[in-house]
Amino acid sequence: MKKALSHDEVEKIARSALAEDEQLVWCGAPDPRASLIQHARIAIFGSGVGFLALWWLSRLTDHGIPDLTKFHYTTVFILVSFFLLLIGLAMMSVPLVVHRNARRTVYALTDRRCMIVRLGKVRRIRSYTREDIGKIEWMIGPRGKDNFIFGTPEATVKKGGTPFRRAGFYTIPDAKAVEQRLREVFRMPEETA
C-alpha cells in the first residue's frame, strides 16, 4: 500500500498550483488512516447487508437451484438478494476508496483562496475564494484529526463536488488553527453561537 505524501511533497504540489503572485499560507494533506476509521461504520453496515443477502440467497436456493427461465416468486427474491449483495459489497469498499483518495489529496490555503488538489492521471484543482466559503464549521474527527468545512453547497456543486458533502479540509491535524488562519487571511469575523 502506498504511503501518504510527505510534508515536502505536499508543499511542492501546493506551490506548483499557485498563481504567479500568490502566497502560500498553509498546506497539508488528509490522514488516510483517520479517513478510513471515519468511514468504518459504512463498511460494518455494508457487511451486515451483504451477509443478510447471502443468508437470504442460501434460504431461497435451499431446495435446489430454481428454474430461472420461468417466472416464479423466488426469481424476484433471488434478484433482490443479488442486488442487496452488490449494495453490501459497494458499502464495504467505501473506506478503502476514501483511504486511496486521501493519499492523493493536498489541501492549501493561500492569500486568495482555499485549494483542494486531487492527484491522479489528471490533476484536479478546486479553488474556493472568499465568496465561495460561506459558513465555516469545525468538527472533531478520529485520532486527533479534525474536519474543517467551508464551502457553500452551491459552490461545492458548481466546482464539481457532490451536494451531499460540502467542501473542506477533512482529517487534518489542528483544523482549528487552519480556521483561524483562514479568518485572518480573508478578514472574516469569528462566529458566535
Positions of PLM-derived features:
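Short, charged cytosolic
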Residues: K2-G28
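Acidic, Ser/Thr-rich low-complexity segments on the non-lumenal side of membrane proteins
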Residues: R113-V157
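Long, distal/terminal scaffolding or interaction modules
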Residues: E20, S47-F51, S127
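A residue-level signal for beta-strand positions that form part of recognition/binding surfaces
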Residues: Q23, V106, N147
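Alpha-helical transmembrane spans
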Residues: R33-R104
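Conserved beta-hairpin
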Residues: W26, L89-D132
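A membrane-cytosol interface segment of integral membrane proteins
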Residues: K2-K3, I140-A193
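Short, mixed charged/polar active-site loops
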Residues: Q23, V122-I125, P163-R166
